[in-house]
Amino acid sequence: MNQVVIYTDGACKGNPGPGGWGAVLRSGTLEKELFGGELGTTNNRMELMAVIQALGALKRPCQVALYLDSQYVRQGITEWIHGWKKKGWRTAAGQPVKNVELWQRLDELAHQAGHRIEWHWVRGHAGDPGNERADMLANKGVEQVLGR
């Protein structure tokens, strides 16, 4: 099983507002950078999109070390999602899960695509080179949708 290290990040100028996502994928000596954005979005949606796009870029099941600065995504996929699914995609308070279509896509990629994923939280803007690069790519995604 190929080993891949992934760093992801999302950015939003205003929340909601124009946003971007970025991902850095490394396997051995190979490195791939991905980014994109949307005009009307939120930071949490962009954090989710970064992980979805990164995992979606993998061509076969991999052993993944995934680094992200979003506790929302890390806790959502490792802790909260099981309860949401049991409750028909509702929160503990009975409210519909926000960004449900993205959570469902991430669930499919994370749990049904055959990947073995270790989820690692890193503090954002704390000098981690992979996180800083993903942040730069996310901001590039914002600039792209703004036509700059």
From Swiss-Prot:
GO BP terms in the entry:
DNA replication, removal of RNA primer
Give the keywords, sorted.
Cytoplasm, Endonuclease, Hydrolase, Magnesium, Metal-binding, Nuclease
Gene3D superfamilies noted in UniProt: Ribonuclease H-like superfamily/Ribonuclease H (3.30.420.10)
Instruction: Report the subcellular localization.
Output: Cytoplasm
Q: Which residues form the RNase H type-1 domain?
A: 1-143
E.C. number(s) listed in UniProt: 3.1.26.4
Superkingdom of origin: Bacteria
Query: Into which EC class is this enzyme placed?
Result: hydrolase
Cofactor descriptive note: Binds 1 Mg(2+) ion per subunit. May bind a second metal ion at a regulatory site, or after substrate binding.
Cofactor(s) of this protein:
Mg(2+)
Binding locations of Mg(2+) 1? D9, E47, D69
Q: What is its main location?
A: cytoplasm
Query: Can you state which reaction this protein catalyses?
Result: Endonucleolytic cleavage to 5'-phosphomonoester
Any Pfam family: RNase_H
Where along this sequence does the record place binding of Mg(2+) 2?
D9, D135
Q: Please give the InterPro entries that the UniProt record associates with this protein.
A: RNase_H, RNaseH-like_sf, RNaseH_domain, RNaseH_sf, RNaseHI
Q: Which GO terms describe its molecular function?
A: magnesium ion binding; nucleic acid binding; RNA-DNA hybrid ribonuclease activity
One GO CC term, this protein? cytoplasm
Question: What does the UniProt record say this protein does?
Answer: Endonuclease that specifically degrades the RNA of RNA-DNA hybrids.
Q: Spell out the subunit comment.
A: Monomer.
The family classification in the record reads:
Belongs to the RNase H family.
Q: What is this protein called?
A: Ribonuclease H
What is the source species? Acidovorax sp. (strain JS42)
